Amino acid sequence: RMAATSPHNDRLYRETALQSIVARLLRKHGAVSPSPPDAGALSQGRLRRVTRHVRGHLDANLSLDDLADVVGLSKYHFSRRFKERTGQSPYQFVIYERVRAARHLLQETTRPLAQIAFDVGFSSQSHFTRTFKRHVGATPGRYRAAWRA
């Protein structure tokens, strides 16, 4: 009876209970490992995640904070690392992807230009037209007409 209440058994009980709690937390939330030295790098996998996110959400207002959150980096580190990896800023990449998607829609659909502008995330048809012309060298209407000719 004395052995059950000794300080040694009490300490052993607390340690066992604590280990049990930690084990349950790790099973539920996953093991946490220390960050590797290149934790701030924009790996190929992280770059793919950002690319998929941008392409899947072109119609959304894609902020630098949103893109950085996709890969778990601060917006400062994300922006810097993204430009190092791709040669363009995240904003330039989003615009490039919007124009690329618009070209596809102009080629493959008969949707009105205003609808295409909205579908790929431009705030207005005039903004879409200016940006498209700057990147492609023709307005969306002329691009579509030339493609169909």
Regions found by a protein language model. Give the residues of each.
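Short, Lys/Arg-enriched, Trp-marked, Pro/Gly-tolerant hinge/linker segments that flank
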Residues: 3-71, 84-92, 96
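Short, charged alpha-helical segments
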Residues: 13-16, 127, 131
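Terminal helix-turn-helix DNA-binding modules in bacterial transcription factors
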Residues: 52-66, 73, 84-125, 129, ...
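Short, leucine/isoleucine-rich alpha-helical interaction segments at C-terminal helix-coil junctions
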Residues: 21-28, 135, 143-147
